[in-house]
Design a protein with these regions (language model features):
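Nucleotide and nucleotide-moiety/phosphate-recognizing core
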Residues: 2-158, 163-180, 187-197
């Protein structure tokens, strides 16, 4: 089922799986919520909607990634998701990137499709609102025009993609189901989501 809209510019997918998962105590990308490592589960979901899908990781993680999946290594050490997004835009800079963190176990195709359907190409990004009304940077469509702003933040040592979104012209929408944006960073949050999935 390919749901790409060919009247729009190309859309690639990026799974953010290069974090160190310090608070969780184990790699969030390899947690299995649905019988498959989460980084692969998200990549397979994105393949329905995107031209190409890549997994973002640190250089030392590359060999552990299944060879059936394409990889983009982080160009910048210790810069978090912002560095990964810049690395993706450097890799292919003439298309938009749908960037999704690997720690959103309740995310589903309906939510992704809704974001894509509401995409606005004349802003730097289309994103969901968090509970407190802020942009959610880790399930966002970043347009090519975002690159200079992200690079500027990187050069200034400001590694928060959310703050880039807060200062820029973006489209922000409400998720059909806010639970799909629930991210899991700690063992306690993991237990909470496991209870929801039962």
């Amino acid at each position: 089922m390919q749901l790409m809209n060919h009247s729009r510019s190309a859309l690639n997918g990026l799974v953010l799986a290069g974090g160190k998962s310090t608070r969780m105590g184990e790699d969030k990308g390899i947690l299995q919520w649905y019988g498959k490592e989460q980084r692969y589960y998200v990549a397979d979901m994105l393949a329905t909607f995107c031209e190409e899908v890549f997994i973002s990781c640190r250089s030392e993680q590359t060999n552990a990634i299944d060879k059936n999946y394409k990889v983009i290594e982080d160009e910048f050490e210790d810069t978090g998701p912002l560095g990964a997004i810049v690395s993706a835009l450097h890799h292919v800079n003439n298309c938009a990137w749908l960037v999704i963190a690997c720690d959103l176990p309740l995310l589903n195709e309906k939510t992704i499709h809704y974001l894509i359907q509401n995409r606005e190409e004349n802003v730097i990004a289309t994103t969901f609102s968090t509970d407190d009304g802020l942009p959610e940077p880790l399930i966002t469509i970043w347009e090519p025009a975002a690159l200079p702003l992200l690079e500027a933040a990187l050069s200034e040592g400001k590694y928060s993609p959310q703050k880039v979104l807060m200062k820029a012209k973006i489209k922000i929408i409400q998720a059909p189901d806010p639970n799909t944006l629930l991210n899991v960073n700690t063992p306690a949050e993991k237990e909470k989501v496991m209870a929801l999935l039962k």
